[in-house]
Amino acid sequence: MKTVSVAAKLSVLLVLVFVGLAGVAISAPVTVKGYVLDSACAFTKGLDKPISRECATSCANAGSQLVILAEDGTIYWPIAGATPSSGQNPKLLPFAGQKVMASGTLYKRGGSTAIVIDKIEAQTAANK
């Protein structure tokens, strides 16, 4: 019968730990500056900013989720910080079509980026 060295057992354990952690979302505090627009336009139209406030509001009222399109092109999906979860459109709708500054907790997993918004405000000359 072969014996397995302690180093080999430890190596297997470390691999299992890292594989297990790969599925865990990474979170960190963040402040994001960008435009609030509907998710369909963010993906399908290649926009840098919303066409208009009315367009973003109309799509949101029809059920499209609002997102924040950051200055660097990252799309942030607003999510609730508790479960059962709720949609975040009511929080974003007053800012539809506007440039905002949002702060909260960032989550990244599987190539997606989300934010639990603690504070959101329209970006003005004073807070740029």
Where are these regions (language model features)?
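N-terminal secretory signal peptides that target proteins for export/translocation
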Residues: 1-7
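Bacterial N-terminal signal peptides
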Residues: 9-22
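OB-fold and OB-like single-stranded nucleic-acid-recognition modules
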Residues: 23-128
